[in-house]
Swiss-Prot record:
Protein name: POC1 centriolar protein homolog A
Database matches in Pfam families: WD40
UniProt keyword terms in alphabetical order: Cell projection, Cilium biogenesis/degradation, Coiled coil, Cytoplasm, Cytoskeleton, Repeat, WD repeat
Any coiled-coil regions, as ranges: 367-395
Keyword Coiled coil part of the UniProt annotation: yes
Cross-referenced SMART domains: WD40 (SM00320)
Entry's localization field: Cytoplasm, Cytoskeleton, Microtubule organizing center, Centrosome, Centriole; Cytoplasm, Cytoskeleton, Cilium basal body; Cytoplasm, Cytoskeleton, Spindle pole
Tissue specificity field: Widely expressed in embryonic and adult tissues.
Quaternary state and interactors: Interacts with POC1B.
Organism: Mus musculus (Mouse)
Amino acid sequence: MAAPSQEDPSLERHFKGHRDAVTCVDFSLNTKHLASGSMDSTLMIWHMKPQSRAYRFTGHKDAVTCVNFSPSGHLLASGSRDKTVRIWVPNVKGESTVFRAHTATVRSVHFCSDGQSLVTASDDKTVKVWSTHRQRFLFSLTQHINWVRCAKFSPDGRLIVSASDDKTVKLWDKTSRECIHSYCEHGGFVTYVDFHPSGTCIAAAGMDNTVKVWDARTHRLLQHYQLHSAAVNALSFHPSGNYLITASSDSTLKILDLMEGRLLYTLHGHQGPATTVAFSRTGEYFASGGSDEQVMVWKSNFDIVDYGDMKARRPPPLTSSSGTLPKMDLPVPPGRDRSLESVQGEPQESISMPQTLTSTLEHIVGQLDILTQTVSILEQRLTLTEDRLKQCLENQQLIMQRTPP
C-alpha cells in the first residue's frame, strides 16, 4: 500500500498508429515528444500536446528494435533488424542518415550524456561505439559469446554496461576498452540493462522473470526481485534513483521502491506482453508499449512530493574507493526527508541555532541516511542468503529421501 503522501499512477494518453508490436519508447528531453518503434518497420513521433498530429518515419526495411533521443533532443537514433542504424532529425520532414552498423540485428542504441558518442549492441555478439556526428566507427567490445540485447553508457560516459543471451551482464571501461567485470547471476538470457542515475548501481532484467541490482564498484548483488510471472523485457530508473519500473511478458508493469526494497504498484494496461517502458527525463511521466500495438503514457504521481524534496536536499556524496569509478550519491529516503521538511519549514527566528551547528546537524542527518541505506542493503543480502540456505536444505532433504537405506 502506498504512503499517504503518494498518489497512484494514472493513464494520461494512449496512442494508436503502429500496425504491429511496439518494441521501444523514449521521451525527448523536454517531454514534448515521445518516440516509439515497432515490428511494422516504422518509427512514430507522438506529440504530448493533445490534438497534435504524429509523425511516421519510414526508412528501415525491417522491424525497428530500439530508439533513443540525443541529450539535446535534436537527434533521434534507431536500430533495426535490417542491421542498420539511422540518425533522424525529429521533425515533419523525417530526414535521416543511415549506416550499416552490424552484421546482424541491431538490438540497442544509446547516446552518451555529452551527445558525442553512440553505443550499439547486436545479434552479431558485439557492442560498438560510434562518433555521433559523422557516424564514424570508433571501436568494438567483443567478449560476449551470444546475442547482445542491450548496451548503455554510464551517466558520466566513462563506463558501458551490456546484457546478453550468454546470461551475463558485462561492465566495460570506455577508455581502456577492457571488461571490468562480468555478472553471471542470471539464470537465463539477460534482456535489458541500465545504470542507476547516480552511476553507482546497475539493474538488469531477464528471461528468468527476475530483476537484479548490483553495485557497480564492489560488483556485489544488492537487490533481487522475482515479482513477475514471465520474462522481464525492459526496465527504467526514475531520475531520482528511488524507483524502478519494469515491463513484462505477463502483461504488467511493476513499480519498485528501491529505498524500501518492495513492490509499490502493479499496472494492468496492455493486452498481451508489455515489451518496453521508459520514464521521462523529469520522471513526471512514463511510457509503455506492448504487443497489442499500443503506446501508453502514464502520469507518475507517486513521486510528486518526494522527488521535489530530494532534488532540494541530498546528503554529501560518499566517495568511491577507486578513482576510476563514479562517486556514490545516495538519495534521501522519502520518510526521512519529510521529517526534515517539517523542521526546516518553521520561521528562522524560532530556531535559534548557529549556522555551523545547523550545517553539522544536516551533515549528521545525511550520514544517518547513508547508514539507513546500508542497513537496508544488508537486510536484502541476508534475506537472499536465507533463501539460498533454505533451498540447499530442501534439496538435501530430497536427496536423503531418495537415497535407499
